[in-house]
Amino acid sequence: MAESLNGLKRTVMCGELRESHIGQKHVVMGWVQRKRNLGGLVFVDLRDREGILQVVFGEEINKEAFEKADLVKPEYCIAVEGELVRRESPNEAMPTGMVELKGQNIKILSESETPPIYIKEDLDTDEAVRLKYRYLDLRRPDMQKIFKVRHKTAKVIRDFLDENGFLEMETPMLTKSTPEGARDYLVPSRNYPGMFYALPQSPQLFKQLLMVSGYDKYFQITKCFRDEDLRANRQPEFTQVDMELSFVDMEDVIALNEKLIQKVFKEVANVDVQLPIQRITYKEAMDKYGSDKPDLRFGMEINDITDAVKDVDFKVFKDAIENGGSVRAIKAPNCATMGRKQIDKLGEFVKTYKAKGLAWIAYKEDEIKSPIAKFLGEEGINKVIESLDAKVGDLILIVADKDSVVLQSLGALRLEMAKRLEILKDNKEFRFAWVTEFPLLSYNEEEDRYQAEHHPFTMPMDEDIEYLESDPGRVRAKAYDIVLNGEELGGGSIRIHDTKLQEKMFNVLGFTSESAWERFGFLLEAFKFGPPPHGGLAYGFDRMIMFLAGTENIKDVIAFPKNQNAYCPLTEAPNVVDEKQLGELGIGVQKQK
């Protein structure tokens, strides 16, 4: 039967007690990790958010407390009053391992059924079970460590931005749907039947309005929502650290955020980030790494060998070059002895990225093996080896096709090889980079129009503005992403604040004046009243915590996440609502066949 506290007050957390507290009387409260009955003594490991403390009950200490302690089971919630003493058998593996509490009084605050999951670190349990019983999963010490990291990170960010003159301001959760990119989550309006709010994909438009309003420096740590197909490490609702600044250029935003990154990683994870952070253009990132978020912790860079093979009589290479494509390669060190079956699997791998196949050259000490040797000849093979500065033991992997296919497939193959060779196993390095000079626009062949790579309010680079209408694909953006170990940590841009330039941008994107005003009229109207030059950046806060806490699963850093199907096993959301609620909203549900 559950007991009440009856005025009993906790004096200290379990994990805080040390030798300096010996001789003091304390009250601790928490959950029973385990219990051992050794005849005349009962030992209870008591756990709270700060750690585990051993409590000993004995007939000679207090018989009533001893008998009650013998009734407890794992995950019972209890309160214990007693005196802290030195342990006879210390456990140096525990922070509290030199002391124990002599239990003189115990209250069983609530009982527990046998938990469906073990409350321990490094739990190897099916994810569906963990999510269904998330409140138990969150009791585990390793999970609690993660959320302490999350809390500390948010505090460091808030303190830093406050010290740098930022105001924390909130923007609406119920806003206007402006579909461009991912699908919106829609919220029906009862007051306006047939009309809908949208949950924000980002606070983009409102933070720009705050700059028009003269708030100069804004930030918030806020929820954002995207109704998109969930890939690994994506969630339908996620947290963003969002900021916007007035009267700045790209260098100002980057300089401030480098200091923020340095402070966060030092204070939270004791990682020294050297400034300035390396910069790499979008073109260089794609040409060398086949990715706009390159992992710089290892080499194996992509090399263009088109010139080296342009004269060889090999149809695959010739066709690619004649059609405006290229022939490129990566070299995998110490892989020349890789078996044919393994290489064939790599060939199948690149085909998933639309490559037609994978050519290869194994540069061994006593021979050079390659299925294309008969086409390239000794001279052609040597040209490839020289152009790559290949060494004995290297395996050269080659793709020929249009540039987009070559770069994407070799970029993915580079990461796959690092994984197979365990190049990054136990690698604790943090390699940051700014990626800059992104294309402002990309051409959507299906819709036969240009679309914004970031959003329609991104400022073109000054020297490229003249090409916006005549050659839109050539225009680069004043956009910048901060990349860490092959993942995008955040991204931002300088915004357009010139209404005439914004109109040109909408025109290039295929918006009529009417459709632009229908979607973004409130922002365009505001821009009639002296908007300042402004720009900003947003971090994926959940992804940042993954790095700081050392976990590879985004669900580990969100208290109550959805599963891969955007479903919550704990609350069983989304769920059916009753007809009355739907009727009030003027909504009818069409059942899918």
Curated annotation (Swiss-Prot):
Natural source organism: Clostridium novyi (strain NT)
This protein's GO CC annotations: cytoplasm
Its job: Catalyzes the attachment of L-aspartate to tRNA(Asp) in a two-step reaction: L-aspartate is first activated by ATP to form Asp-AMP and then transferred to the acceptor end of tRNA(Asp).
Gene encoding the protein: aspS
Region annotated Aspartate, chain positions: 204-207
Enzymatic reactions: tRNA(Asp) + L-aspartate + ATP = L-aspartyl-tRNA(Asp) + AMP + diphosphate
Enzyme nomenclature, EC number: 6.1.1.12
UniProt-recorded name of the protein: Aspartate--tRNA ligase
Record lineage: Bacteria, Bacillati, Bacillota, Clostridia, Eubacteriales
Family annotation (PROSITE patterns): AA_TRNA_LIGASE_II
